[in-house]
UniProtKB/Swiss-Prot annotation:
Organism: Marinobacter nauticus (strain ATCC 700491 / DSM 11845 / VT8)
Record bears the keyword Ribosomal protein: yes
SUPFAM superfamilies documented for this protein: Ribosomal protein S16
Any one GO molecular function term: structural constituent of ribosome
Any single GO CC term annotated in Swiss-Prot or TrEMBL for this entry: small ribosomal subunit
Name by which UniProt lists this protein: Small ribosomal subunit protein bS16
Family membership: Belongs to the bacterial ribosomal protein bS16 family.
Keywords: Ribonucleoprotein, Ribosomal protein
Pfam families: Ribosomal_S16
InterPro entries assigned to the protein according to its UniProt record, in alphabetical order: Ribosomal_bS16, Ribosomal_bS16_dom_sf
Keyword Secreted belongs to the record: no
């Protein structure tokens, strides 16, 4: 099954997440089909906290991809 989920990046104690479209059998930070945005949970000041390519997310959801719980919350907040 294709899922839209977060892949962790950044460094120790400074998480940064990419919103990725991937096969659910792949590891969290492993192979992916497409990156459709990012989430920076510790953004400060003018730094961008969330960016989502809504057009591509809607395309993948239309193709039957499932969003993870956290990604679904982020997509709702991005509207």
């Amino acid at each position: 099954m294709v899922t839209i989920r977060l892949a962790r990046g950044g460094s120790k104690k400074r998480p940064f997440y990419h919103l990725t479209v991937t096969d659910s059998r792949n590891s969290r930070d492993g192979r992916f089909i497409e990156r459709v945005g990012f989430f920076n949970p510790i953004a400060r000041g003018q730094e961008e906290r969330l960016r989502v390519n809504r057009e591509r997310v809607d395309f993948w959801l239309g193709q039957g991809a499932q969003a993870s719980e956290r990604v679904a919350q982020l997509l709702k907040a991005a509207q």
